[in-house]
């Protein structure tokens, strides 16, 4: 009498071994609505612990909202030829610089609207070396907010609490 339930349980367990879930994630309709933004390599960013422009580009690309265009190296004080950036397909351009001063890094950044030929944002902060990456995330947040109208979440932290 006990062998029948045991056999049924064994059969169910053997059948379950072969079963596995396949997870498939599709992101549709993102590429046609992406905002093209050019992000220049920040002047002297190789002196900082974090490569500012690389962090910013990665944040914007991973959001799915932006199509990042490589702008090469530029300084935040360089003259901007808006028609050149429009012809390259960029709706916005982010430029910046990083300078070390007394053990801190002065990070400067500007965001331009290439269609309206106008400056949208500027930011300048002196940060400790360990916060250069966080500053890059904050710049990505600012770009996200200025171009979408929604607050960015790249510099936020996620907390997971269990009871």
Regions found by a protein language model. Name each.
Residues 23, 78-142:
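Amphipathic beta-strand/beta-sheet edge segments enriched in Tyr/Trp
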Residues 95, 158-161:
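Residue position within the beta-strands of beta-propeller blades
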Residues 21-29, 144-147:
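A short, compositionally biased domain-edge/stem linker segment
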């Amino acid at each position: 009498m006990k062998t029948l339930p045991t056999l049924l349980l064994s059969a169910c367990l053997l059948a379950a071994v072969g079963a596995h879930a396949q997870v498939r994630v599709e992101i549709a309709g993102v590429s046609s609505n992406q905002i093209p933004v050019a992000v220049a390599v920040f002047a002297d960013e190789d002196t900082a612990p974090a490569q500012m422009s690389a962090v910013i580009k990665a944040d914007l690309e991973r959001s799915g909202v932006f199509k990042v265009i490589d702008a090469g190296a530029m300084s935040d004080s360089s003259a901007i030829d808006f028609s050149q950036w429009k012809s390259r397909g960029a709706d916005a351009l982010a430029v910046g610089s990083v300078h070390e001063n007394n053990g801190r890094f002065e990070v400067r950044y500007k965001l331009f609207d290439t269609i309206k030929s106008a400056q949208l944002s500027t930011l300048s902060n002196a940060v400790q070396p360990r916060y250069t990456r966080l500053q890059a995330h904050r710049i990505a947040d600012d770009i996200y907010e200025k171009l979408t109208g929604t607050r960015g979440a790249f510099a936020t932290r996620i907390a997971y609490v269990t009871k």
